[in-house]
Amino acid sequence: MKVSFEQLKAAFNRVLLSRGVAVETADACAEMFARTTESGVYSHGVNRFPRFIQQLDNGDIIPDAEAKRITTLGAIEQWDAQRSIGNLTAKKMMDRAIELAADHGIGLVALRNANHWMRGGSYGWQAAEKGYIGICWTNSIAVMPPWGAKECRIGTNPLIVAIPSTPITMVDMSMSMFSYGMLEVNRLAGRQLPVDGGFDDEGNLTKEPGVIEKNRRILPMGYWKGSGMSIVLDMIATLLSDGASVAEVTQDNSDEYGVSQIFIAIEVDKLIDGPTRDAKLQRIMDYVTTAERADENQAIRLPGHEFTTLLAENRRNGITVDDSVWAKIQAL
C-alpha cells in the first residue's frame, strides 16, 4: 500500500502520544521515523516502529530522559544517554560532534547507556549535508555468531561513513551480510536474498531470509573479516564511552538497551579548499563509474547515491508500506 509522509508521521505521532510521550518529543521522534521511511530505509523506519513501541512499553526506553555530558577532553566528549529515545539522542550527539569539529577540525562523541538509533545513516548524512565527513557506529546485543561458531556472541554493529560529495556518498552497513531489518524486508516481499546471508539448520549457506531470522545464524560480512570488524568496533565503542560491551548488553540486560555508540565529524574545509575538494571527489566518482561493466544492463553504483532517487520517487508516488506492518501500527 501507499501512504503519504503526513499520514505516516501522524500514525507514529498518535501512538507515541498514547504512550504519554511529551508533545514536542513525540513530534520530533515521529518526524525522524517518517523521514527514514520516506528515504527508502523501510527496515529501520516503519518496519522497526512496532519494536520501538514494544521497548517503550517495557520501560527499556525512557522518553523524558536527556543525554548528559560526563567528560570533556578537547575534541573528545563522553556522554551518558540515560536510556533516552535512540534516534533523537543520536541526532544530538552528531550535532555535538560537528560543533567540536568546527572548533578543533575533528570532533568525537562517545555515548553510553544508549538505545537503538534506528537508521544509522541518518547521522552520517546529517554531517555530510553540512560539509563534514561523518563517521559513526554502535554496538548491539549479540545477534551474530563469530566466524567459526554456531552461537551468537557478537553484534552486527553497523558502521556509517558519509562523504560530502555531490550527491553525498555514504556507506551504511552492518557487519553482517544483511541486517535483520533487511532480512525482514526481503521475507515480507517474498524474495530470496541476492547472495548468501546466513546458514540453515544443517549448517549450509542459504539465501532464505526467514530461515536465518529464525535460527539467528546470520553471516558476517566478508566471513572472518566482518566478524573481526564487529569485535574491534565493539571494543572501541566500549572503551571510549566507558559503556557496555556486546557481552554486557547481552548477558546483563533483558533486551537490547544500554548500548555504546561513537559519533565522529571531520571538517574537510580546514584541510583542503572547496574547488580542489570537489574536483578530487568528482574524479574519484567518474573513475569508478566509467569502469567497463560486467553486465551492460547493470550500472556501476556509488554507495548512498540511490537515496536521492528513492526520496524523490517516494515524494512523487507515495511511500510503500507493507500491509501487515501498517496493520500492526494501526493496532498499537
From Swiss-Prot:
The broad enzyme category this protein falls into is oxidoreductase
Q: Tell me a Gene Ontology molecular-function term this record carries.
A: NAD+ binding
Cite the entry's keywords alphabetically: Cytoplasm, NAD, Oxidoreductase
One GO cellular component term of this record is: cytoplasm
Catalytic activity annotated for this protein?
3-dehydro-L-gulonate + NAD(+) = 2,3-dioxo-L-gulonate + NADH + H(+); 3-dehydro-L-gulonate + NADP(+) = 2,3-dioxo-L-gulonate + NADPH + H(+)
Q: Where does NAD(+) bind?
A: I168, T169, M170, V171, D172, M173, S174, W224, K225, G304, H305, E306
Could you give the subunit structure recorded for this chain?
A: Homodimer.
Classification via HAMAP family = Diketo_gul_reduc
- Which protein is depicted? 2,3-diketo-L-gulonate reductase
Per the record, the gene is: dlgD
